[in-house]
Amino acid sequence: YLLSVYLFCLLPKLQAQDIDFPLSLSEIEKYESRIRIQRLPAVTITHADAYKIRTRQPVYSPRTKEIVLDIINMDGPTAELEYHNLKQMVNGKWLGFPFIDNLVFAIGGRDLSKGDTLPEHIRMSEFKYPLKPNRYQANFYVFANIHTYCNLTGKSIVSIKETEMDGAFAFKVLPSNNDSIRILFENHTNLEVQPVFFPSISTDERYMVHPFARSGWVGEANYMKSRARLKGGEAILFTIPVSWDVNRITDRNDKKRFQAGRLLSGKYRIGLQLEIYMDTEFEVK
């Protein structure tokens, strides 16, 4: 269980050269010139608890060695279980309940499909301090990869309707002229949702066909955290031009690869990575 490193511990160690991306770090970080992000008015909450967590009992003893959470996919897309943490109530505020130093976790590898319930074990040996009589909050998130398709022609960009996502999350390409791909994501749950990076643009045969789309760079993830975290009932629109300035690409091979300077007519796969956050409370008496 305690084998590898938290995702958030891994990300800061990434170097620009570790990312299979055609732009230099300085160009990656020109976020506003790559993609436009627009937050939209509230949407209807139709799937309030698409994912839920609950403790198996509401009250625990200070001598408790392990707390088991049930992670439930009520009505959301398949998601991968990630990691937990605890908070404690201090003077009317939720404050972090610290882990022991240098604690590492094995995460990932457990998929939660619609209708499934999976356990998450919280071992008190992971934390610096024992439980004391108080109120506590358990926090957890799951990771989902969603996608949809569109067709780009010489005159327009049209969504492929049968690939559009609806339900807990709506994800689709809006019809537009052929100058920009407009990607709509709507959160119809009452949960907070974080798009991790910019949307990706690929084909069924080739990943990453647009040099200004998703980079995977930690700075891009931090940029998204500051601008694109959505509360329940919020939505966001991404606008990505179909053309790019080849001169912003420095590597000779990458410049040749993207020398057309624009997406050609064809079918494109649009992807988005999501973190979906949940919490539940329990007491220690």
Language-model region placement:
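Short, solvent-exposed, Trp/other aromatic-anchored flexible loops in extracytoplasmic proteins
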Residues: I100-P133, N145, W217-S265
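Bacterial Sec-dependent N-terminal signal peptides
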Residues: Y1-D18
